Regions:
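A conserved pocket-lining segment of Rossmann-fold NAD(P)-dependent short-chain dehydrogenase/reductase
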Residues: 1-19, 43
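Short, intrinsically disordered C-terminal tails of secreted or membrane-associated proteins
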Residues: 180-183
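Aromatic-acidic/polar surface patches that form glycan- and anion
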Residues: 13-21, 48, 115, 119, ...
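Short, well-structured beta-strand/strand-turn elements
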Residues: 131-140
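Acidic, Ala/Val/Gly-enriched low-complexity intrinsically disordered segments
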Residues: 175-177
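Mid/C-terminal beta-alpha module of Rossmann-like enzyme folds, strongest
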Residues: 24-109, 114, 122-124, 128, ...
Length: 184
C-alpha cells in the first residue's frame, strides 16, 4: 500500500516551513530573556524551507512503503473512527498505548497539508536580535520518527535489525541536524 500525500497536488509542490518544538522553546526563552528582543514580535521557524514532493518520498522510505501520490483528504474526518484500528496496531506490536487523538493533531495536519501557496517566513528580525540557531527540517522529521520508534509509539520496520517482525528505518538519511548553539 503506498503512502499517499493527504493534500492537493499544489500543496505537494509549494515551499513549506515547519518549527521544531525544542527549537521553538529555545527561541521563546531567548526572546523573553534578552534585551535585544524586548517588546518585539518574532517569526520562529526552523530557518529552512522544503517541498513535500521532496520530503514525502523520504517519509515513505522510512516507513518502508512505496511513495504514493497527492490524494486530498481531511485527516481530521478520516481518522475519526480509526481508534480501534490503532489499538490493534499497538497490541500487535507491543507499543506504548496512546490514544490516536493524542498522537497527532489531525486538524493541524490538515492545515499543513492543504496549504497551496509558498510559505517563506522572515526570521531576519530574530537573527538580528541575536538568536541564530536553526534546525534542518528533514533531519528533524527523521529524528522525531526515530524518537517515536525508540519510545515504542511507532512500530519498528520489518527490516530493522532489532526485530524480525516490527516497523523502523533502514533509510540512510544524508542530512544531519544543523543546529547551531545560541547563547540562551
Amino acid at each position: 500500500m503506498p503512502l499517499d500525500f493527504p493534500g492537493t497536488p499544489a500543496g505537494y509542490s509549494v515551499l513549506s516551513e515547519l518549527s521544531d518544538a525544542t527549537y521553538l522553546a529555545e527561541a521563546i526563552v531567548f526572546i523573553s530573556t534578552h534585551p535585544t528582543a524586548r517588546n518585539a514580535a518574532f517569526n520562529v521557524t526552523n530557518g529552512d524551507s522544503f517541498r513535500w514532493s521532496r520530503v514525502w518520498p523520504l517519509l515513505a522510505q522510512w516507513f518502508e512503503m512505496p511513495c504514493g501520490v497527492p490524494r486530498p483528504m481531511k485527516l481530521a474526518k478520516w481518522m475519526e473512527d480509526k481508534g480501534p484500528v490503532w489499538d490493534k496496531i499497538v497490541a500487535r506490536h507491543g507499543l506504548e498505548w496512546r490514544s490516536l487523538e493524542t498522537i497527532a493533531s489531525w486538524e493541524f495536519a490538515d492545515f499543513v497539508f492543504e496549504k497551496e501557496w509558498d510559505l517563506l517566513t522572515d526570521v531576519g528580525r530574530l537573527r538580528r536580535a541575536g538568536f541564530n540557531a536553526c534546525v534542518d527540517t528533514i533531519a528533524m522529521l527523521h529524528s522525531q520518527l526515530e524518537n517515536y520508534r525508540d519510545a515504542r509509539l511507532l512500530p519498528l520496520a520489518r527490516s530493522h535489525p532489532s526485530s524480525g517482525r516490527l516497523l523502523g528505518s533502514r533509510l540512510c538519511w544524508m542530512v544531519r541536524a544543523s543546529r547551531s548553539s545560541s547563547s540562551i
